[in-house]
Amino acid sequence: VSMEPYPTPNMVEQNLHEILEEVSFTDRIIFGRTNYSKVANAYEGHRHFYNECATEVISFCQEHGIDYHIKEKTITEE
């Protein structure tokens, strides 16, 4: 399951954990940020937001034995 581009809350308000539970049947999750979007980059704390989301995806996948790939530049220095 590809979860990219994943929007920031100023684009769409959604619950990442609920989405992960819905796709827990899969054997692989690909997660990535919304790139090249002025709207996503305008979200205050977008780097922190994506770092937190990536951490949640990694933890969920490890707990459920799901392979995962976090796209390049999703995890960044804050």
What residue ranges belong to the model's regions?
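Auxiliary Fe-S-binding modules of radical SAM enzymes
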Residues: 11-78
